[in-house]
Amino acid sequence: GIRDVERSRALGDVYKRQSDYCMYCLGWNYSNGEGVEQNMTEAIRWYTAAAEGGNADAMHDLGWHYDHGEGVEQDMKKAICWYERAAEQNHPAAMNSLGECYAMGRGVPRDLETAMEWYRRAAELGEAMADYNMGWHLEQAGKLSEAYAHYRKAADGNDDSAWWALGRFYENGVVVAQDGKEARRCYETGEKLGSVKCKMRLARCKLLGIGGRREKKAGLDLCRQALELAKESSEKEDYGYEAEMNLLRRTIAENES
């Protein structure tokens, strides 16, 4: 009867969603070399199949590959299209990615107001990176208390760059009382999460004795190592990255004699 037809349709929908998710997982495995040899062509093939089937994670990841030209030729039109389709399904990372595109004028006209709106929506859904991005733009606009609040929220969500931002605020006494020990703790936390910017700052802290004992020789070695690592890092596109490298270069030069 009608109920049997409805049940069959519902089951069909479940199977389809599971199938789309499995295709997404295959794409992710090929993209990251997890359990299989890394193969970007296969990754894109499976991401595309899953995205066309309606999987929002696949839509976002496929958009990211088109955005960054990884495994496919860079195509910002397709990147924006897939980000938007994922965002329509309330995918927080896709909303954040759209925010980044509008903030940088990548594939769309630069529009900071629209960028901040996408960041806000993503942050409300728990996307820590969106809180960090909002914090950065608020900091650049001189709204330091608001920036600090977003950095703190992002750090609570384990965003590594947010720990770098908080460390700078404590190191320089911005909005909060100057506290070298707390600055160093922030950098240590961010470094453990993989932040190269935190690694650069932490090396500098050890060399200059910020928040702890000064270790000139060991500090210099750490600074040089951090700088070499920074040159090769995929973080290079991050806000403030070039300025951090320049600060570390200056610190090394001033302390080598």
Regions found by a protein language model. Give the residues of each.
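Single conserved hydrophobic/aromatic residue that forms the stacking wall/gate
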Residues: 1-18
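Canonical positions in the second alpha-helix
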Residues: 13, 49-50, 85-86, 121-122, ...
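Short helix-capping/linker turns of helical repeat alpha-solenoids
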Residues: 17-20, 32-34, 39, 52-55, ...
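Hydrophobic face of amphipathic alpha-helices that form TPR/SEL1-like repeat modules
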Residues: 23-32, 59-68, 95-104, 131-140, ...
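TPR/TPR-like (Sel1-like) alpha-helical repeat modules
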Residues: 214-232
